[in-house]
């Protein structure tokens, strides 16, 4: 891990091929203001005070050349993101201006920041706990409004405060028990039943957190949905209708889609990656064969398969063959997935036709009737997908916060340690045995919030951040 007396610099805005309106270069550290003063020319008598914005020019101190017209934002310690002196150059957008300003900052004595180092400094300086720091990364990566709201809840302490209270209760119980070990004759005996009740209450609180883990993972990472079926059943039309775009080429010619086309959607707060695949059939065309093979691989990697059928033709032998292939490969790879049958081209049927009017010679399976051409039934498709997800006990609804995978693993350890404490109490073991697992629970909670954490854990967490955050 780097030394944190250094002054660090990074581009804090996204670097994209398209030019942005503003690009920001951020400095943090003891030399941030001095470096800024060596590079920034502020006309007139503008005061260099905290939380003031200065107008002026960035100059190369060696050549005196003007690099950019910019605004300078000063945030002096401790009233800053990192609780160090922080300076931001607000430059014109585009790659060249911000890169030149960053190079000048480094030449003046700053070093390039590591990924997540600004937030790491905020954590080390006590502005954020570890769950709040993780929430920063989750907010930046959020793919839906729901994911952003959950990340913001973590950032504002909805995770940190109750977890700290659970840890404090563990430490208080430890103090009570260890006092009896040290001063056996001077203190009244403990009430094992009362201690056990407190432990059970802690377990209930931990279980409430653990119950959010699966839903949190779903909201953060989303679902991968593969649209599969034989050629010309309307798979690409379904993708276009669902995404309200023309991502996929649509023609009457079988085999038009030769490669996988992706689209990103949000349904009920859940990010969904939709994969439109090539029509699955036997073919002599080498390029189409590759597309068909990729379709099969995409189906196996998906969380949900939409098997599209031409409702005007009904269930055909080709549809059955595709269904059988999917079932066989899933069994071989032990990767069970949800399958939803989509009866497309309802516009070619009578308006009174319902799903039950179209016989499907397979086990009962969720089925939706729709028309990609007229975009009728898309809402019912989304409802069916949400129903499948919720049927597995996972929903994005009514979720105020959610723990991530790291936090869930540590809380599982806490729950197990508390179980061991209850077992020790029930077995009437000496008090020393109670303290062993209470210490373990408190340590796991400390690792979770950052109150007891190793350098390797911090490195692992913050390496996943973007540079400049």
UniProtKB/Swiss-Prot annotation:
PROSITE patterns: G_TRME. GTP binds at residues 232-237, 251-257, 276-279, 344-347. K(+) binds at residues 232, 251, 253, 256. Transmembrane segments: none annotated. Pfam families: MMR_HSR1 (PF01926), MnmE_helical (PF12631), TrmE_N (PF10396). Its EC number is 3.6.-.-. Residues 222-390 form the TrmE-type G domain. The keyword Electron transport does not apply. GO terms for biological process: tRNA methylation; tRNA wobble uridine modification. It comes from the Bacteria. Mg(2+) binds at residues 236, 257. Its cofactor is K(+). One of its GO terms (molecular function) is GTPase activity. Belongs to the TRAFAC class TrmE-Era-EngA-EngB-Septin-like GTPase superfamily. TrmE GTPase family. Exhibits a very high intrinsic GTPase hydrolysis rate. Involved in the addition of a carboxymethylaminomethyl (cmnm) group at the wobble position (U34) of certain tRNAs, forming tRNA-cmnm(5)s(2)U34. Homodimer. Heterotetramer of two MnmE and two MnmG subunits. This is tRNA modification GTPase MnmE. It comes from Thermosynechococcus vestitus (strain NIES-2133 / IAM M-273 / BP-1). The lineage of its organism: Bacteria, Bacillati, Cyanobacteriota, Cyanophyceae, Acaryochloridales. The gene is mnmE.
């Amino acid at each position: 891990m780097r030394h944190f007396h250094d002054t660090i610099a990074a581009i804090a805005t996204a670097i994209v091929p398209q030019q942005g309106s503003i690009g920001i270069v951020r400095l943090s550290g003891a030399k941030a203001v001095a470096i800024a003063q060596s590079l920034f020319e502020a006309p007139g008598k503008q005061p260099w005070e905290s939380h003031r914005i200065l107008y002026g020019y960035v100059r190369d101190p060696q050549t005196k050349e003007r690099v950019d017209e910019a605004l300078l934002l000063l945030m002096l310690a401790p009233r800053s993101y990192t609780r160090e002196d922080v300076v931001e150059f607000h430059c014109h957008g585009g790659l060249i201006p911000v890169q030149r300003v960053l190079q000048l900052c480094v030449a003046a004595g700053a070093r390039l920041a590591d990924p997540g180092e600004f937030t790491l400094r905020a954590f080390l300086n006590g502005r954020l706990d570890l769950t709040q720091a993780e929430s920063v990364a989750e907010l930046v990566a959020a793919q839906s409004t729901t994911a952003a709201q959950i990340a913001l809840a973590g950032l504002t302490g909805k995770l940190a405060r109750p977890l700290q209270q659970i840890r404090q209760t563990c430490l208080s119980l430890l103090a009570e028990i260890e006092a009896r070990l040290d001063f056996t004759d001077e203190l009244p005996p403990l009430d094992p039943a009362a201690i056990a009740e407190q432990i059970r209450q802690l377990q209930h609180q931990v279980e409430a957190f653990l119950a959010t883990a699966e839903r949190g993972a779903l909201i953060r990472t989303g679902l991968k949905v593969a649209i599969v079926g034989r050629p010309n059943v309307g798979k690409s039309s379904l993708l276009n209708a669902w995404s309200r775009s023309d991502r996929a080429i649509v023609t009457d010619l079988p085999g038009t889609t030769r490669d996988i086309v992706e689209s990103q959607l949000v349904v009920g707060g859940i990010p969904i990656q939709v994969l439109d695949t090539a029509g699955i059939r036997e073919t002599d065309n080498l390029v189409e064969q590759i597309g068909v093979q990729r379709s099969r691989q995409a189906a196996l990697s998906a969380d949900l398969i939409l098997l599209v059928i031409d409702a005007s033709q009904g269930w055909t032998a080709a549809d059955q063959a595709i269904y059988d292939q999917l079932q066989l490969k899933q069994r071989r790879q032990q990767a069970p997935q949800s399958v939803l049958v989509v009866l497309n081209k309802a516009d070619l049927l009578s308006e009174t036709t319902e799903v039950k009017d179209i016989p499907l010679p397979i086990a009962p399976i969720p089925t939706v009737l729709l028309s990609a051409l007229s975009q009728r039934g898309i809402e019912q498709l989304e409802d069916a997908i949400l129903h499948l997800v919720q049927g597995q006990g996972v929903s994005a609804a009514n979720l105020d916060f959610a723990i991530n995978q790291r936090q869930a693993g540590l809380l599982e350890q806490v729950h197990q340690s508390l179980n061991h404490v209850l077992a020790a109490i029930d077995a009437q073991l000496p008090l020393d045995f109670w303290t062993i697992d209470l210490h373990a629970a408190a340590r796991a909670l400390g690792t979770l919030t950052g109150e007891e954490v190793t350098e390797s854990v911090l490195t692992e967490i913050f390496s996943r951040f973007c540079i400049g955050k």
